[in-house]
């Protein structure tokens, strides 16, 4: 379950930001999950709640936003949206794609008191 380590990293980022800005409590966090990140939302929510325990983010609302993946098609020279790793280009049906975005988990925003 790599969701746990991803959430640990996210909470470390949140903690650092809270310390830098003298924040005592985080009330909400927005995570952006790429379509190709291979994470389960329920596992992220469960893991996030566990790793937030005892931190400034304990009890905060977690908002998850999904980001479509984008890839460069070497056959038609276009940036295209894809939804799985072994996808074909939706424009030319070529199979030579380079994934550019959509395979990560990012802390997009933090709401504080």
Curated annotation (Swiss-Prot):
This is Hydrogenase maturation factor HybF. It comes from Escherichia coli (strain K12). Ni(2+) binds at residues 2-3. Monomer. Changing residue 76 to A: Affects stability and solubility of the protein, but mutant is still active. Belongs to the HypA/HybF family. HybF subfamily. Changing residue 89 to A/S: Affects stability and solubility of the protein, but mutant is still active. The keyword Kinase does not apply.
